[in-house]
């Protein structure tokens, strides 16, 4: 049986997508605690009262997804594998159970994501970069649906000098370069991504400036 998985879901305004994702998670036996992190008080107040196994927390509006992820880690704890999911992702049956099994069975994998393409894979694929909106089989780790193994979750926090971008790149390089683990796309677990619904319909203020600043900081840190 797969190890239990805690789940962190940042959200702002895609309540339909969030409800669909929660429905997917409700039938996955590996899922333990789910934390919904609301981007601002208005979002928090709009969310329905949580059911069993679901908690909701709030961060000041616009502080960035890295602070949202860290707030979620604080809420669910660091004792289990942690999945970080966007609210515009749909998971196929037992997706997180499959990812958890992969982490349990291969101690060299530090971070893993489902196959998010329409291309069938016969084996897990090691990756050295991130998805980058490439859904044709050439993309890497999916920041919109990634799971960090428990022993790394115990010591990792997202870099809050970044705001909205490059967090998946940052954790990928930490896992592979700093800690010496592998990053993998799992061939048996699958998901579908609606490609940044919130960014397209309700983007952060100063979108271009924030992207540029995150890019400059990330490159100075790693490249």
Language-model regions, residue ranges each:
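Short, flexible, basic/aromatic active-site loop/helix in glycosyltransferases
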Residues: 116-143
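Conserved donor NDP-sugar-binding/catalytic core segment of glycosyltransferases
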Residues: 94-126
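A short, conserved alpha-helix in the catalytic core of glycosyltransferases
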Residues: 140, 145-146, 151-152, 156, ...
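Active-site donor/metal-binding and catalytic loop motifs
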Residues: 184-205
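Short, well-formed alpha-helical segments that are part of the catalytic scaffolds
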Residues: 14-27
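Acidic donor-binding segment of Leloir-type glycosyltransferases
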Residues: 25-58
């Amino acid at each position: 049986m797969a190890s239990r998985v805690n789940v962190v879901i940042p959200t702002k305004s895609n309540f339909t997508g969030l409800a669909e994702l929660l429905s997917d998670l409700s039938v996955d036996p590996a899922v333990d605690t789910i934390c919904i992190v609301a981007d601002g008080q208005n979002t928090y107040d709009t969310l329905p009262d949580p059911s069993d196994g679901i908690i909701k927390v709030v961060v000041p509006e616009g502080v960035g997804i890295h602070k949202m992820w860290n707030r979620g880690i604080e809420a669910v704890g660091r004792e289990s594998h942690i999945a970080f999911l966007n609210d515009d992702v749909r998971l196929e049956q037992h997706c997180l159970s499959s990812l958890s099994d992969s982490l349990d069975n291969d101690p060299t994998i530090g971070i893993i994501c489902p196959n998010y393409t329409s291309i069938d894979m016969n084996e897990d694929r090691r990756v050295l970069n991130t998805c980058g909106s490439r859904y044709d089989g050439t993309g890497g780790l999916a920041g919109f649906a990634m799971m960090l193994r428990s022993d790394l979750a115990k010591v990792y926090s997202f870099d809050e000098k970044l705001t909205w971008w490059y967090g998946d790149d940052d954790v990928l390089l930490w896992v592979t370069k700093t800690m010496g683990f592998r990053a993998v796309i799992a061939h048996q677990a699958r998901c579908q991504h609606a490609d940044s619904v919130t960014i397209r319909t309700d983007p952060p203020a100063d979108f271009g400036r924030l992207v540029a600043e995150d890019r400059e900081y990330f490159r100075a840190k790693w490249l």
